[in-house]
């Protein structure tokens, strides 16, 4: 286990919707928000067990380990639960980029569509079919 989460909050105590809870992922040092994704019980348990983020893909309907294809993993340093117990904050050490579009953060555009984030890799080179 990556950190002292004992006793871990029971997933059933969290206010999930259809068995999923929102997870906000933030860089531990810079506090930059990297991404948001959903976790089910298995994803949270795998994350705690391995220290690497795991999420539930709503589109593929399956568990996925962040960085499994790209190598751009998120090493979990701390997990916090919000006051309403309906979302999680994961403080991580990001290896490479968090966004599958090649940016450090999934929040790389402003409302006008202007790119304001840092591109850290070329997706075509990482996600070869």
From Swiss-Prot:
Pathway: Amino-acid biosynthesis; L-histidine biosynthesis; L-histidine from 5-phospho-alpha-D-ribose 1-diphosphate: step 3/9
Signal sequence region: none
GO biological process annotation, one example: L-histidine biosynthetic process
Cofactor section: Mg(2+); Zn(2+)
Catalytic activity: 1-(5-phospho-beta-D-ribosyl)-5'-AMP + H2O = 1-(5-phospho-beta-D-ribosyl)-5-[(5-phospho-beta-D-ribosylamino)methylideneamino]imidazole-4-carboxamide
Enzyme class: hydrolase
InterPro entries per record: PRA-CH, PRib_AMP_CycHydrolase_dom, PRib_AMP_CycHydrolase_sf
Binding site for Zn(2+): 83, 99, 106
SUPFAM superfamilies on file: HisI-like
Oligomeric form and interacting partners: Homodimer.
Family: Belongs to the PRA-CH family.
Protein name listed in UniProt: Phosphoribosyl-AMP cyclohydrolase
Upper classification of the organism: Archaea, Methanobacteriati, Methanobacteriota, Stenosarchaea group, Methanomicrobia
Gene: hisI
